[in-house]
Amino acid sequence: MRAAYIMGEDPLQTDAELSAVRKAFEDLELVIVQDIFMTKTASAADVILPSTSWGEHEGVFTAADRGFQRFFKAVEPKWDLKTDWQIISEIATRMGYPMHYNNTQEIWDELRHLCPDFYGATYEKMGELGFIQWPCRDTSDADQGTSYLFKEKFDTPNGLAQFFTCDWVAPIDKLTDEYPMVLSTVREVGHYSCRSMTGNCAALAALADEPGYAQINTEDAKRLGIEDEALVWVHSRKGKIITRAQVSDRPNKGAIYMTYQWWIGACNELVTENLSPITKTPEYKYCAVRVESIADQRAAEQYVIDEYNKLKTRLREAALA
């Protein structure tokens, strides 16, 4: 692999074993990032292609509920920003694969003609109804989509849903005296995913900010001499990060829970790249760690502030460059 073209993702924040990910990026000859914010990954790119955000263009949203929702441009983009589809079209054309569209409706109509289940979900119908769930095969007003995909029976020989059992596989990472606790990465309301968007929202930053939290059981915290809201070090075989303890009876004893979106308290620095043989997903939910209290909390607080400021400065300088 010699190059990477990344759109709307931040693997230098979200992938497991971030030290290995950074090394992989350094070995690439070319890194292109197309995004709306300056992320950690964008700061490591050779070429940055800034694109418009959802409020600066129109299009169609979809989700796991099979729904299509047309959305409209709210404001004109500043500077000479292009939409994702315009950027892709120009690059493809210059690389010898001509792509010429005048608007998003032309792209959507092409998709409709390729997929019979989408064909009836026209731009006009989505604009009138606001929401359509596929299958929607007829362009007439009579076909307003399908609320229940399998209302009476499933698409199986006997009409029943099929369930399959999975064999339990032991975690690859192992607990030891040096790393006696289990880290499981989770998601919570507030800052979502890699935090690129929510981290730029002042209201959400006021609810919770760097370096994030590690939820720890009350008994474990007492044994380790850790108080609620205190800064702590979390170590694994792959690295260490600083974070804030959130002490309660909610976590299981012997386990800590961390969300992976924090920039300073990036728990994916700790997670090992042990891949599932079936899904090829890393062991995000099981990582052997050690939690240590920090005696000098004032110095620790200043360390977090300094690291946060250095990161923001680096991202700003990368954006200006």
Functional labels for PLM-detected ranges:
Residues 20, 27-30, 35-39, 73-93, ...:
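Phosphate/diphosphate-binding loops
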Residues 7, 11-14, 54, 61, ...:
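Hydrophobic alpha-helical scaffolding
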Residues 78-80, 84-132, 199-215, 219-321:
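Long, contiguous, secondary-structure-rich segments that constitute the structural scaffold
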Residues 37-72, 262:
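Flexible glycine/proline-rich, aromatic-decorated loop/lid segments
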Residues 5-26:
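Glycine-rich, anion-gripping cofactor-binding loops and their flanking helix/strand elements
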Residues 1-5, 64-73, 90:
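Short acidic (Asp/Glu) and glycine-rich catalytic loops that position anionic groups and cofactors
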Residues 108-203:
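Long, low-complexity segments enriched in small/aliphatic residues
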